[in-house]
């Protein structure tokens, strides 16, 4: 974790409640690290694995409305926090909330969320007056990574579509994304690493063996992708589709037939 975020006014040194809180920000990258270990440690992925000055999150304190917070630019003091409780919980979303969810408090704590983009959620607990607050983020969606049979980013001519449900409901105050049961299956274009961002899926029920879950198109020919065994689609756990000779390997170890 890098401690970037907090500045301090000399005039306020005598009153701790007026000093800016130092926020240290970290992202749980264990699932990505495990993936690279299984496939290629030299693989560089376009995922958010650290924060930089100027990144904007949405932050809520003690279930109050979410407000934009530019890391390393904005500051927060205990004096500005409207709560009398001793143990305070901070909640944060990245990217920032840009719809009506940004102004919803605990009474309306859910929002609809569309698949495709990467979503992270962070939480921290601190005793009121504490100088340092450590926000720890986790991935709430499921990144999909296309590799070739040698474990390198796939840059061939094939295009891949998965046919899954792609809309969820997110709890704004624990970050969890659940599948919207009313959502219909739709075609989801899976981006390549070279596109500069990964396609992220909504967490959903286990894909059952035998299900047709998409298709590969190459030079006008289309072939179905059928799961040979049950496959989990769970938050934070990246899915790898590796193109090997005459087959596709799903998640680094689960074979699919085309």
Segment roles from a protein language model:
Residues 1-3:
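Bacterial N-terminal signal peptides
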Residues 5-258:
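Sec-type signal peptide cleavage vicinity
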